[in-house]
Amino acid sequence: TPGAELRVESDDGPSLVTVVADHSGNAHVAFVPAEHKVISSTEEWADVLSTGQILAPGVYSVVDESTGSTHGPVRVLSVEDLPDPSLYRQELEEGFGYLEVRDGVTLSIMVRFPNEDLYGPAPWPTVIEYSGYGPSNPDAPQPGSLLANLLGFAVVGVNMRGTGCSGGVFDVFSPAQAADGYDVVETVARQPWVLDNKVGMVGLSYPGISQLYVAATRPPSLAAITPLSVIDDLWRQQWPGGTYNSGFTRAWLAQRDAETKVGGMAWDQARIDAGDEQAAANQAIRSQNMDFERFGRAIDNFRPTLDARRVETVVDRIDVPVYLTGAWPLRFTATQSIA
């Protein structure tokens, strides 16, 4: 219900936070303040993590304070909470489509097969490009996808939750994005057109960084990754030496905020205008996307709760071959590569 005050309680009773549903009746909770408070807009989340915590996996209840009714139990999944294997039996066809992940969110995907006249019939070696840019844009393949396709690979471009035509709330480099990547790898690998039912990942910068988070979840069907031009710590990229990076990082986050709004990318709005009902439905919760540029500015001191988003803390879990390159462009102000 629009304007409803929804109180989140942990399984053992304490009230954690109350959120006010937006004009569409949507609400989203990913963080918990140090003390219970009412959050009436997504802009207020920016100040929560500076003193609060990430909402931990577990069982919760939601109480509608206007009616007293309780909804739940609501289970918050962890990356390790794997779905029933039947989820990975989805059939993916050439062209634009959607792939469902473990919490029911659908991600927009673009499947491109190689030229059969040059490379023969399926199955083909297959790679995934996964980011919040436009990897599932049917009319503009990303560089990694384009090159791989020309070299004889089947390519699957996947937009992260909350971006492009995908559903869900955008939360940069969150555990949910890593878990989604696991589900994407396992679903794609089971397609009959995938050689040896193994896939790799490609991409530079954003889709390069995302590979490291996904590989750290150890999807059994992942063969190798090729992360190019990556960073090691998003917070230190935004606060190098304790000084706010008002250059590239500020602009990059501001662009992510703009592009993840409803119809924020021209191509996703074009699909909606052309009658893509799934794309339109997936935009409904975009009002819950946070302002990440403001969010990052609010965290002017490093918090241990940010460790889950530090590439440096997850890469030791990767157990597949890695081809990694680094970069030192002028737009970056901190060491970018992982030692």
Regions found by a protein language model. Name each.
Residues 78-122:
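N-terminal cap/lid segment of alpha/beta-hydrolase-fold proteins
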Residues 117-124, 129-167, 331-334:
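Short substrate-entry loop that stabilizes the transition state in hydrolases
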Residues 115-123, 169-177, 183-205:
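Gly/Ser-rich "nucleophile elbow"/oxyanion-hole loop immediately N-terminal to the catalytic nucleophile
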Residues 142, 213-317:
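Accessory cap/linker subdomain of secreted extracellular hydrolases
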Residues 21-33:
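Glycine-centered loop-to-beta-strand initiation motif
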